[in-house]
């Protein structure tokens, strides 16, 4: 085995590509490394196409092995299970830029598997996996019009940073991943701390320029290690069949695409399609229905795109920059903490915000260690939202991806945990869908958060842009419909506030998208976003002044960190009894900060007073009311402040001589005692003699709570 190795500098990092030593039975295999983060990527492509195959079966799997970080998986089985949300998102990140680079009509099955086998905590594996996948596909010989490059762009101290480390990313106001060929950008995925449109575009251009070093290196690598290019020829169009479909359907489809209501339009199109299939197969039963459907779909595309390029109204009658009618309702669910329904045309999202305590935070076990997520965002896309039946179960890749995009859009305006000590979960239920449901989720989430009283920094809105490009002519579309997304050349989603962009996602199906086109799209998106924000601000101009009556209220108090063990108690007994008896939730930080969550304010005051008692210092000479906890021959043990026990010796129970302790005291009896002494070991000596009732020092719970508040 003589491996072929290609090494090159990529910003501050060194990238190594190696092939020829491992997985030699795969169509292609590349070990890609960047400063000790290593991802092994394989490509297997089938030479034969399944009979009747009418789509491109590309599968991308991304998997992280815990041994990469020197760890053993948890759980009973001690092995990796189903893909995590993070793994699913990275698989999509790899898939999105490579899928458009396979030629139309190529239906051979291809599987890309990226396995993380070593990880440097400072280098994220996602970029390495994308570079490895690009290299493996380029080596494989399949008709792949790559290679692609991939880059991460940060923004620190008003400067773009190429492939920042994990430490640098924490300081960055931008996390932007760009992938593209030597000529054009194909994909953008980003999250930003309210940057301007100009800054976002500059970051995309910067990233595309910097990734050229990757593309050139892979080309050189392929010259040395690449397999012969497949002798694949695109199937010739069946002119006779195309003309037959046109003759039957073209005029009728033109009329159907003037129906503005989605369901009625779809019913009409389905009827035309069924008629076309019936007429043509009646003449020739051997004709493949799939080919008829492909030609029918291409005809739909020609009609819709041709009208848009010609400047005619869009499918629903709008101009290119018009946003569909908006309808907003807040506070729609009576017992939830915050809710809103956001409707844009035939797309509708029911967004619900829920407030929880720190113990509700999601613990995410990553290769580099555990972290807690205090802002959760879940997106659900049930089949009824598009008038269909279907399976309902765990979220699919698309739902996970859309939820993450919507979360990115809102994350920049969320308050810190110090400003708002709640874990926040937003769920977006898509109840209707006809394009841009993820951006409807951003708008709905912003409204629901404000309805819940979450002090977000500003309202956030999202908009999806589209593109139709024919040679030198192009038209940018605002607020695209589902059909315009399907038949167009670009899906360009922008979320942001009035001040700037918080998230940008772009998927491009063609080459030739210039910075000029992206600038027009960003400017048009900004105009649409301002319009939507104006309507949202009329519905709810600012976050509610107070949280819901049904949400837990968090009360904070400070105690001496040395007293934490007293509040927790042996085996957690004390804190458990406090929470069970008062119906509250208690979290204690290492610095002595105690957070009490309770729906009932009286319960919170009660537990705060009891904690004050527990941590209060016992003073020598002070008189307390206590409770007898146990009896002994030599005296009685009495619990005073915070259940601290002291001993009343038999000689200190009464003025007269006491023969038997039980003649004077019983377990559970309340008595007044005076602290005689606290020795070096913390033992408390008590007396019941010489007490002056008027001078009792008793802890008053209500007073102590009021002092804390």
From Swiss-Prot:
It catalyses: RNA(n+1) + phosphate = RNA(n) + a ribonucleoside 5'-diphosphate. It is an enzyme of class 2 (transferase). This is Polyribonucleotide nucleotidyltransferase. It is found in: Cytoplasm. Residues 621-689 form the S1 motif domain. The keyword Metal-binding applies. Its main location: cytoplasm.
């Amino acid at each position: 085995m003589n491996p072929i190795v290609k090494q090159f500098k990529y910003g501050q990092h060194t990238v190594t590509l190696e092939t020829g030593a491992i997985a030699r039975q795969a169509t292609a295999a590349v070990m890609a490394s960047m400063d000790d983060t290593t991802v092994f990527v394989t490509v297997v492509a089938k030479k034969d196409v399944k009979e009747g195959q009418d789509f491109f079966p590309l599968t991308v799997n991304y998997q992280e092995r815990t041994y990469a970080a020197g760890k053993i998986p948890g759980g009973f089985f001690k092995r990796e299970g189903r893909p995590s949300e993070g793994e699913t998102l990275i698989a999509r990140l790899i898939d999105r830029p490579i899928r458009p680079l396979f030629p139309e009509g190529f239906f051979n099955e291809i599987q890309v598997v990226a396995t993380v086998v070593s990880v440097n905590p400072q280098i994220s594996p996602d970029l390495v996996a994308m570079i490895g996948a690009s290299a493996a596909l380029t080596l494989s010989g399949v008709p792949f019009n790559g290679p692609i490059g991939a880059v991460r762009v940060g923004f620190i101290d008003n400067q773009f940073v190429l492939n920042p480390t994990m430490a640098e990313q924490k300081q960055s106001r931008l996390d932007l991943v760009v992938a593209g060929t030597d000529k054009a950008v194909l994909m953008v995925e980003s999250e930003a701390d309210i940057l301007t449109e100009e800054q976002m575009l500059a970051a995309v251009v910067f990233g595309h320029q910097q990734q050229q070093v990757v593309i050139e290196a892979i080309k050189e690598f392929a010259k040395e290690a690449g397999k012969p290019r497949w002798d694949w020829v695109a199937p010739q169009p069946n002119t006779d069949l195309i003309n037959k479909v046109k003759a039957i359907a073209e005029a009728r489809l033109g009329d159907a695409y003037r129906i503005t209501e989605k369901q009625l339009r779809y019913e009409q199109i389905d009827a035309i399609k069924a008629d076309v299939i019936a007429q043509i197969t009646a003449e020739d039963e051997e004709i493949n229905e799939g080919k008829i459907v492909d030609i029918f779909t291409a005809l739909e595309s020609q009609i819709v795109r041709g009208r848009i390029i010609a400047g005619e109204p869009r499918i629903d009658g709008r101009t290119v920059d018009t946003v569909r009618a908006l309808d907003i309702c807040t506070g729609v669910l009576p017992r939830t903490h915050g809710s809103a329904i956001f409707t844009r045309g035939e797309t509708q999202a029911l967004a619900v915000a829920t407030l929880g305590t720190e113990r509700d935070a999601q613990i995410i076990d990553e290769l580099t260690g555990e972290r807690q997520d205090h802002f959760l965002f879940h997106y659900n896309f049930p089949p009824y939202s598009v008038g269909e039946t279907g399976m309902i179960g765990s979220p699919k890749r698309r739902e996970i991806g859309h939820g993450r995009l919507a979360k990115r859009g809102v994350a920049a305006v969320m308050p810190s945990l110090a400003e708002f000590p709640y874990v926040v979960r937003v769920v977006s239920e898509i109840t209707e869908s006809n394009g841009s449901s993820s951006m409807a989720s951003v708008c709905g989430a912003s409204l629901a958060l404000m309805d819940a009283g979450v002090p977000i920094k500003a309202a956030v809105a999202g908009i999806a842009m589209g593109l139709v490009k024919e040679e030198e002519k192009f038209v940018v579309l605002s607020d695209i419909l589902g059909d315009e997304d399907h038949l167009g050349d670009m899906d360009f989603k922008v979320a942001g506030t009035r001040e700037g962009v918080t998230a940008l996602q772009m998927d491009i199906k063609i080459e030739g998208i210039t910075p000029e086109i992206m600038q027009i799209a960003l400017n048009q998106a900004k105009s649409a976003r301002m319009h939507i924000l104006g309507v949202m601000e009329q519905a709810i101009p600012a976050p509610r002044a107070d949280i819901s009556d049904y949400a837990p209220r968090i009360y904070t108090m400070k105690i001496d960190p040395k007293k934490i063990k007293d509040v927790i108690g042996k085996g957690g007994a004390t804190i458990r009894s406090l929470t069970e008896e008062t119906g509250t939730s208690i979290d204690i930080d290492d610095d002595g900060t105690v957070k009490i969550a309770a729906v009932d304010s009286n319960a919170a005051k009660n537990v705060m007073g009891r904690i004050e008692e527990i941590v209060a210092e016992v003073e020598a000479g002070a008189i307390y009311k206590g409770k007898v906890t146990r009896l002994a021959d030599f005296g009685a043990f009495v619990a005073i402040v915070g259940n601290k026990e002291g001993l009343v010796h038999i000689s200190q129970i009464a003025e007269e001589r006491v023969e038997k302790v039980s003649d004077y005291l019983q377990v559970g009896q309340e008595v007044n005692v005076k602290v005689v002494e606290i020795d070096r070991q913390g033992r408390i000596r008590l007396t019941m003699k010489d007490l002056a009732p008027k001078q009792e020092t008793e802890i008053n719970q209500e007073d102590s709570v009021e002092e804390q508040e």
